């Protein structure tokens, strides 16, 4: 009888030791939950709505300000305005309204979306309202933002909105194809590039930059 109890204790001992390692003092490390996506907010603190139109405005005023607008690219043979520009000051014309088209149902920070100038246009020019990034401009040695993109396709038309390290938001260009073939300016860690401003023929043109990204806000129209 004593021998049977001895062997029973030997059998139970590993189970007791194993179970003791998963007490409240030694919890199982389960995978952490994914962070809840943060909605992008407009200047009134409201969530951006895919069915609404917004102006992309600067976080600065005066000569440092200026809205984003649709304009004609220099030396372009496109039949419609095909460049993404920013006015030289916040005193003057208002920017061209845009709408944001997310891959999901809502517009969140750090998620892929398309951007489209939301204006009346003829059928010929519909595609010339959708943002994309053009080929390398050898004169400015950067890639300029232009129109002529597509919605919902894995090409050069995907962007992200992220919180600025200063104030407001930044725009990122995020190609689906691995750089540098598609985007030599995109960082290797997340395949995205910052959107900033360069000077082209005296106008501020949105382009991919290595530093000083454009800080923007979204004003509902």
UniProtKB/Swiss-Prot annotation:
GO terms for molecular function: aspartic-type endopeptidase inhibitor activity; serine-type endopeptidase inhibitor activity. A motif (Vacuolar targeting signal) lies at residues 26-31. Induction: By methyl jasmonate and wounding; but not by sucrose. Residues 24-32 form a propeptide. Gene3D superfamilies: 2.80.10.50. It holds the Pfam family Kunitz_legume. Keywords: Aspartic protease inhibitor, Disulfide bond, Glycoprotein, Protease inhibitor, Serine protease inhibitor, Signal, Vacuole. Residues 1-23 form the signal peptide. Belongs to the protease inhibitor I3 (leguminous Kunitz-type inhibitor) family. PROSITE patterns: SOYBEAN_KUNITZ. Coiled coil: none annotated. Inhibitor of cathepsin D (aspartic protease). May also inhibit trypsin and chymotrypsin (serine proteases). Protects the plant by inhibiting proteases of invading organisms. It is found in: Vacuole. Disulfide bonds join 80-125, 174-186. Its main location: other. GO terms for cellular component: vacuole. The record marks 99-100 as: Reactive bond for trypsin. CDD domains: beta-trefoil_STI_CPI-like (cd23372). This is Aspartic protease inhibitor 1. Tubers, young leaves and flower bud. Not detected in root, stem or mature leaves. Has a single chain structure. It comes from Solanum tuberosum (Potato). The record marks 143-144 as: Reactive bond for chymotrypsin.
């Amino acid at each position: 009888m004593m021998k049977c109890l001895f062997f029973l204790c030997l059998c139970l001992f590993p189970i007791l030791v194993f179970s003791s390692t998963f007490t409240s003092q030694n919890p199982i490390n389960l995978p952490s939950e994914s962070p809840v996506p943060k909605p992008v907010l407009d200047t009134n603190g409201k969530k951006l709505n895919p069915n609404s139109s917004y102006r992309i405005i600067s976080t600065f005023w005066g000569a440092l300000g200026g809205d984003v607008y649709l304009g004609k690219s220099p030396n372009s043979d496109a039949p419609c305005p095909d460049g993404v520009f920013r006015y030289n000051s916040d005193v003057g014309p208002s920017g061209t309204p845009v709408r944001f088209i997310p891959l999901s149902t809502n517009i969140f920070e750090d998620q892929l979306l398309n951007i489209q100038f939301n204006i009346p246009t003829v059928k010929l020019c519909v595609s010339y309202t959708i943002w994309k990034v053009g080929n390398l401009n050898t004169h400015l040695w950067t890639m300029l933002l232009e129109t002529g993109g597509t919605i919902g396709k894995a090409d050069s038309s995907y962007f992200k909105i992220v919180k600025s390290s200063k104030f407001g938001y930044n725009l990122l260009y995020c190609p689906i194809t691995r750089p540098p073939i598609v985007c030599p300016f995109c960082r290797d860690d997340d395949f995205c590039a910052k959107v900033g401003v360069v000077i082209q023929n005296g106008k501020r043109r949105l382009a991919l930059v290595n530093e000083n990204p454009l800080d923007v806000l979204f004003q509902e129209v």
